[in-house]
Amino acid sequence: FTEQLTAFEVWLEHGSERKPPPEQLPIVLQVLLSQSHRLRALVLLGRFLDMGPWAVDLALSVGIFPYVLKLLQTTAPDLRQILVFIWTKILALDRSCQLDLVKDNGHVYFIRFLDSPQVPSEERAMAAFVLAAITDAHPKGQTVCAQSGLMQICLSHLPQASSPAGSPLFVRWLCLCVGKLWENFKSLQGEAFLSGAPEAIAPLLAHPIPDVRAAAVYALGALIYVPPDRVELDTDGEGDDGEIKEDAEHSNSDREGQRGGQRSGLLDADRAAAERTIACQILPGISDASPLVRVETAVALGRLACVHSMLFQSAAAWWRRARSGGGSPRPSSGAAGSSFEHEGDGRLAAGDRPSLGESGVIGGGSFDSGR
């Protein structure tokens, strides 16, 4: 084992994508089973994966996944940083292992690492990235991470991370992590509103780092619940089973939370009022100097327009008539939408906005470790 690791280390010094792959790679994976050589093997594997996506793809092709998944069951503190780094590289390229991670409770390993104050913020940011990848468009991952208290942990670390002495990288991934966690998760969104999550994130809209501001806009915009579209039938008349399953998983988790006594529900009027507050908070982002912030603001407002389309259309029609000198009164809103209405100036519907069908740069794009 020692000779094989040394040979692999020599290859790392001189190898590249253009050269033949290392012959020792399958053996190095076997070395992970040896406790005495495990740390050195993991460090060398981390160096190899850091050479680029081609290295990650090669490692996956020779079967690295079951080995590093098994290691998440260990409690050795000296392995934690390098394991989190390796999983960051894997999930940046391949999200297909979401289900296996959740099935084996691998998410708990990263939540504990994230909640370790003695670990440097930059390393905990990698754990936040991994958890964001686990919950990205994955209802089962969202449910189990929420049940493990991920939302409360992320919010509890925001004040220190966003302080002048904090890490902008860490605070950015905390925002992205909670945004992915509660996106289209209605009961968790209700719990977030009731626990003051928007108030904890809103100060980050004035952060000097544009990426942090954009992540904060995304996290706030993800609190706006957009009901799933109707299941579209294909040419054979069969529905999208995956979409039905995802909706059912969230519905089941919502019911379980209610049976457990969690205050996860909001009245429609209260939710509309909370969404109106979010809109007012993020609205200045349309004139932000950063294009990334402006894009995320447009996407968040697009979610709002999707949910309250009738109110937006009514307000836009009123605004056009008022601008042309018609002098017509403000449109009336129903009971469910009245709390959403702006008093006085109707700025939320100031003009026609194009329909937004695409996700934002942060909210909808694929994850990468450099972001």
What would you call each of these model-derived segments?
Residues 11-47, 53-55, 169-186, 215-223, ...:
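Acidic/polar, low-complexity linker and loop regions
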Residues 10, 40-51, 81-95, 125-138, ...:
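Alpha-helical solenoid repeat architecture
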Residues 25-29, 67-69, 109-114, 153-158, ...:
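Buried hydrophobic core positions in alpha-solenoid tandem helical repeats
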